[in-house]
A protein has these predicted regions:
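A generic hydrophobic-helix recognition signal that picks specific residues
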Residues: 26, 40, 167-168, 176, ...
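Juxtamembrane transmembrane-helix boundary signature
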Residues: 5-22, 37-55, 73-95, 168, ...
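Loop-to-helix junctions at membrane interfaces in multi-pass transport proteins
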Residues: 27-36, 53-68, 102, 143-156, ...
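Short conserved micro-motifs on helix faces and helix-strand junctions that flank
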Residues: 1, 30, 44, 171-172, ...
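Glycine-rich, flexible loop/turn motifs
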Residues: 21-22, 28, 85, 97, ...
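Helix-loop-helix module between adjacent transmembrane segments
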Residues: 43, 66-172, 243-251, 260
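Membrane-interface loop-to-helix entry segments
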Residues: 1-23, 95-98, 102-137, 160-219, ...
Length: 318
């Protein structure tokens, strides 16, 4: 885990030399190709909290929700092939959403949008690093407190500070240039890791004798296997899928977290091709989350893992 972090920070320091002006800081000099854009932009939208949230959704709803979520794929292809929003946004030559708002509406609209985005971003950064920090503490079995200079410091706050500090360091070193390079490097690291995780889970759990009995043991009308019973699920159901598809149209290019990637491509055509390729690449992450959720269901509810599951629940409750 430490080696990839050092490699990413090294790439950030190396890429800093290419940051020479405002266009480089905000839009990476508009030099991104389709392959770099497809990897980096998808990686920018994925974090520990994203993995936790997706795994929780599949854990609660099973393969039924995963089946209907496949509708996102053709919708993503249509949006990518048509260049929906991409061409019109690049025609404005705006480098940020704020600049676009001022050009399209007014300066007061830009200020209002900036205030809303800043407040929501502060709230966002109070939740996202907290979830990621909690995950790493359990994953690495870190102690609750660390002795430092006679002070007992909570590991939770230290890991959160590490997350926030790393994000600020990478961003401030070279702006969108370093973000584009480091996200691309992280994406290249992640794909073989996805395959290793999938291979380990498929090797560790037997599908016929361990996985299927758990998936088929759901309540009547709330099957974890039958996609046509999804309307009976409480949280991640057909309405949730419909809202997600609607959001793909209404929220196109609007998320502030990846606004720098909207203007970083070499041309509008390269941006369109990057979005199209990114739709394919996102399936790696999606199915890794599905398999992780199935593994968690099997481990926590399977008869073969009853003792281990009891110990895990006791540890999480303590």
């Amino acid at each position: 885990m430490l080696i990839p972090m050092l490699v990413v920070l090294g790439c950030a320091l190396w890429a800093q030399r290419y940051q020479r002006g405002v266009a480089d800081f905000l839009s990476a000099g508009r030099v991104g190709g389709r392959y770099v854009m497809s990897v980096a932009s998808e990686m920018a939208g994925m974090g520990l909290i994203t993995v936790v949230a997706a795994t929780e959704a599949y854990y609660r709803s099973g393969l039924g929700y995963a089946f209907w979520e496949m509708l996102y794929l053709p919708v993503g292809f249509v949006l990518g092939l048509t260049g929906f929003c991409t061409y019109r946004f690049r025609e404005t030559r705006a480098m940020t959403m704020g600049q676009f708002f001022e050009m399209r509406f007014s300066r007061s609209f830009r200020v209002t949008a900036a205030v809303i985005q800043s407040v929501s971003g502060i709230i966002n950064y109070a939740i996202f690093p907290a979830v990621g920090a909690r995950f790493l503490i359990y994953y690495l079995d870190l102690p609750g407190y660390v002795e430092l200079g006679g002070w007992a410091l909570p590991s939770f706050q230290l890991v959160m500070a590490l997350f926030l500090g790393a994000a600020l360091l990478i961003t401030l070193l070279g702006g969108q240039v370093t973000v584009l390079v480091t996200d691309c490097v992280q994406g290249l690291f992640s794909y073989p890791m996805y395959l290793l995780i999938l291979a380990f889970i498929l090797w560790r759990f037997d599908w016929g004798t361990q996985v299927m009995p758990v998936l088929s043991s759901g309540e009547a009308g709330h099957s974890l296997l039958n996609p046509f019973e999804i309307e009976n699920l409480r949280d991640f159901n057909a309405f949730y899928v419909f809202v997600g598809i609607t959001g793909m149209f209404l929220g196109r290019l609007s998320w502030g977290g990846t606004q720098g990637f909207n203007s970083s491509a070499r041309s509008a055509h390269e941006a369109r091709m990057g979005n199209l390729l990114g739709t394919w690449r996102a399936q790696f992450y999606k199915w890794m989350s599905v398999i992780l959720a199935i593994a968690a269901l099997t481990y926590l509810h399977g008869r073969d893992f009853a003792d281990e599951a009891h110990e895990l629940r006791r540890e999480l409750a303590s």
